């Protein structure tokens, strides 16, 4: 049966638990999955239903969680759970943060269920409204229901839910489980919660007790069965986190492949939830794309590259590169074995080559830093070339300074640029030049001292070494002298 979407009056996300099985100083709901904290996934799904009110319930390290959510969820209401334990008490605390006259559908979900979708929450709200239910519970049939509350039924429908720790042997055999996600009629929820006690093995206020109370009062309790069990899976420990992360990544990769992206080896590719890829992008094996990375059409990334918050232009090639907070222009080439640090901006058709590190540097259109160089705190104009083994010396131990290189510049290998310094348009430099002063446009910079050859130095200073023996042979050959055949050659 197709149900029409319904806008909930409120969505409550429960995120107050300590998560002791994670064995972590970080609150469980802040552990990342696919580039977002667990609770971030839950809040995005909740926000996707367009509720009138969105509430998150916090307790453990509440200030830390609140701070982490402030940027992406500035309008979410935060309710703090007191020392009374249990999901029922958490929902009571959320209701206290909402208008007293709230009416309509209230959805309740959890901050550690990252794959639950907005579409499923909308289906739940729609089924709840269409059935005129007081409570609608989201359920699933699991081959192994261990750890989940069991859904109890009779011939008339759902009669209640029993937590595993309180279940009888007969009830433990039930495979239909409670997802912990509900739709409630607001008034019925308020009234029933006020009558829930703590007479159970854990001494907690169970939200599940509301179902039997509502049913006893004549309210309609129904279930919406979910076929995709991954959507209801929660995170209690690191093993479950890894399982859910792998499934989330598999779904992300499939979504991009169906959208026209080539992913050569899904088994070695990880793409965060907020990454954007255009059609005809190619992702080679061993690639990780994190944060808000954007890759434009026709670009090739990989193999063996990790990009975080990097923008890659159309037709660019980025191979065996580690980059963060950088921009790679259209048709540009990066790598192999390049390191793009924050603030790197490579222009169209430019090149950052093998064993090159860049930081806070702008490299203009068509300019190249082909190999074995460090470019930090620099601006390089268009169509310039930086020779191999060049170092932009930007730090004097106290302050950092900037180097500016103009257009159509040709700099020699093994140059050092001691900032602050400017190299004018069309300038050249010789190999091994240390540039300490500005170079005028069109000038050749060269400051290498004349070469001196100290003849006979090796024979005089390193006698008996293989180098001395080789030098002696060369000298003998050049003068026509026949070397002694019984001379011992050092190994």
Swiss-Prot record:
Residues 239-259 are annotated as: Linker. Acetyl-CoA binds at residues 388, 394-395, 413, 431. Mg(2+) binds at residues 112, 236. It catalyses: alpha-D-glucosamine 1-phosphate + acetyl-CoA = N-acetyl-alpha-D-glucosamine 1-phosphate + CoA + H(+); N-acetyl-alpha-D-glucosamine 1-phosphate + UTP + H(+) = UDP-N-acetyl-alpha-D-glucosamine + diphosphate. Residues 260-491 are annotated as: N-acetyltransferase. GO terms for biological process: cell morphogenesis; cell wall organization; lipid A biosynthetic process; peptidoglycan biosynthetic process; regulation of cell shape; UDP-N-acetylglucosamine biosynthetic process. Pathway: Nucleotide-sugar biosynthesis; UDP-N-acetyl-alpha-D-glucosamine biosynthesis; N-acetyl-alpha-D-glucosamine 1-phosphate from alpha-D-glucosamine 6-phosphate (route II): step 2/2; Nucleotide-sugar biosynthesis; UDP-N-acetyl-alpha-D-glucosamine biosynthesis; UDP-N-acetyl-alpha-D-glucosamine from N-acetyl-alpha-D-glucosamine 1-phosphate: step 1/1; Bacterial outer membrane biogenesis; LPS lipid A biosynthesis. Its EC number is 2.7.7.23, 2.3.1.157. Homotrimer. PANTHER family: BIFUNCTIONAL PROTEIN GLMU, NUCLEOTIDYL TRANSFERASE. This is Bifunctional protein GlmU. The lineage of its organism: Bacteria, Bacillati, Actinomycetota, Actinomycetes, Kineosporiales. The gene is glmU.
């Amino acid at each position: 049966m197709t149900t029409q979407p319904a806008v909930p009056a409120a969505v409550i996300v429960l995120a107050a638990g300590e998560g002791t099985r994670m064995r972590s100083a970080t609150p469980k709901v802040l552990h990342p999955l696919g580039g977002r904290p667990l609770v971030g996934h839950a809040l995005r799904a909740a926000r996707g239903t367009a509720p009138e009110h969105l509430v998150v319930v916090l307790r453990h390290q509440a200030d830390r969680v609140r701070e982490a959510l402030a940027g992406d969820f500035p309008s979410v209401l935060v309710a703090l759970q007191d020392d009374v334990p249990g999901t029922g008490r958490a929902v009571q605390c959320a209701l206290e943060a909402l208008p007293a006259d709230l009416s309509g559908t209230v959805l309740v979900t959890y901050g550690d269920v990252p794959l639950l979708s907005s579409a499923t929450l909308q289906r739940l709200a729609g089924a709840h409204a269409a059935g005129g239910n007081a409570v609608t519970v989201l359920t699933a049939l699991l081959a192994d229901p261990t750890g989940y509350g069991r859904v109890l039924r009779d011939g008339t429908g759902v009669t209640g839910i029993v937590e595993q720790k309180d279940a009888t042997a007969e009830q433990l055999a039930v495979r239909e489980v409670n997802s912990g996600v509900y739709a409630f009629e607001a008034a019925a929820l308020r009234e029933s919660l006020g009558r829930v006690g703590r007479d159970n093995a854990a001494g907690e206020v169970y939200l599940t007790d509301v179902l039997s109370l509502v049913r006893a009062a004549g309210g309609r309790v129904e279930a919406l069965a979910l076929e995709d069990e991954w959507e209801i899976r929660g995170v209690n420990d690191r093993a479950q986190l890894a399982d859910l992360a792998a499934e989330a990544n598999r779904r992300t990769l499939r979504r991009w492949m169906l959208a026209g992206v080539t992913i050569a080896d899904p088994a070695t590719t990880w793409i965060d939830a907020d990454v954007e890829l255009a059609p005809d992008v190619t992702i080679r094996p061993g690639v990780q794309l994190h944060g808000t990375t954007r890759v434009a059409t026709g670009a090739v990334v990989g193999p063996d590259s990790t990009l975080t918050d990097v923008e890659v232009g159309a037709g660019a090639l980025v191979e065996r590169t580690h980059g963060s907070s950088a921009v790679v222009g259209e048709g540009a080439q990066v790598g192999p074995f390049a390191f793009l640090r924050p603030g790197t901006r490579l222009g169209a058709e430019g090149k950052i080559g093998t064993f090159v590190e860049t930081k806070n540097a702008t490299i203009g259109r068509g300019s190249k830093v082909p190999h074995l160089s460090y470019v930090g705190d620099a601006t390089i104009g268009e169509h310039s070339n930086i020779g191999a083994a060049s170092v932009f010396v930007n730090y004097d131990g106290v302050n950092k300074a900037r180097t500016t290189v103009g257009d159509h510049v040709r700099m020699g290998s093994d140059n050092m640029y001691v900032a602050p310094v400017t190299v004018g348009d069309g300038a050249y430099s010789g190999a091994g030049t240390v540039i300490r002063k500005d170079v005028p446009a069109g000038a050749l910079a060269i400051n290498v001292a004349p070469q001196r050859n100290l003849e006979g130095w090796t024979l005089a200073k390193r006698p008996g070494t293989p180098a001395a023996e080789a030098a002696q042979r060369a000298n003998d050959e050049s003068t026509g002298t026949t070397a002694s055949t019984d001379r011992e050659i050092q190994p």
